[in-house]
Amino acid sequence: MNKKMRISLFLTSVLYSVQSHFSGAQTIQLNGNGISESIIRSITGTDGNEALNISVPPETNYNENILSVESSVNIKGGTSNTSIGGAGVYGVNFTLNNNGSIWGGDGYNGGVAVSGNEILIRNYRNVYGGNGLGGSGSSGGAGLSGDDIIVDNYRSIYGGDDVGGTGGSGVTGSNITVHNSGGILGGNGVNGGDGINGSNLFITNDNMISGGYGIKQGEMLFLEIKSL
């Protein structure tokens, strides 16, 4: 094999890795050894299902199960015309380093972009909740949703829009720690979505947290306070 042919085959392989696209739900098994697994191809879910399901070994923690979404990769939950759009990424007990774009699927109610519990999320690019399409009574999806989550945000997290209903929250759940150096915004709608909505929250904000726009603007921060 001559040199020019070897270079041509190498470039073809690289372009295939970057540009190839999966359709339908994909499951990735993380290794639990603290070494990151990388997603280098875009993934789109179908029929309101998740795009990417995360599986982890038993008796491991989120610091040992690491997933990286690489630059120029798009992960989007499946669209549903009658129900909730699918999550972009769903899982429990893992770390997500996002350098691409993650979207919840559009639906009667928009899907959540990243959904699960016991997650550390480092967001270096964009996370979008899915758009709600159902009209009155429907809602956009949250950018991030779950319990026991740590969010390090350096770029943008958006709740999904719903022109006839309520915008989704940027981040929602309980027992959530947020370090924000970028923007966290609720989705737009008849009622604007909250920037952050939940209970037992610890927030350090160095940039912007904003509710979405609507006839009634969403709250920058909505807290549920329970008496002890």
Identify the residue ranges that each predicted region occupies.
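Positively charged n-region of N-terminal signal peptides that target proteins for export
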Residues: 1-7
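Bacterial N-terminal signal peptides
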Residues: 8-19
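Boundary at the C-terminal end of the N-terminal hydrophobic targeting segment
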Residues: 17-27
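All-beta strand scaffolds that present successive hydrophobic residues in beta-strands
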Residues: 34-45, 54, 62, 67-71, ...
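Glycine-centered low-complexity coil/loop motifs and glycine-rich tracts
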Residues: 45-51, 59, 73-88, 99-113, ...
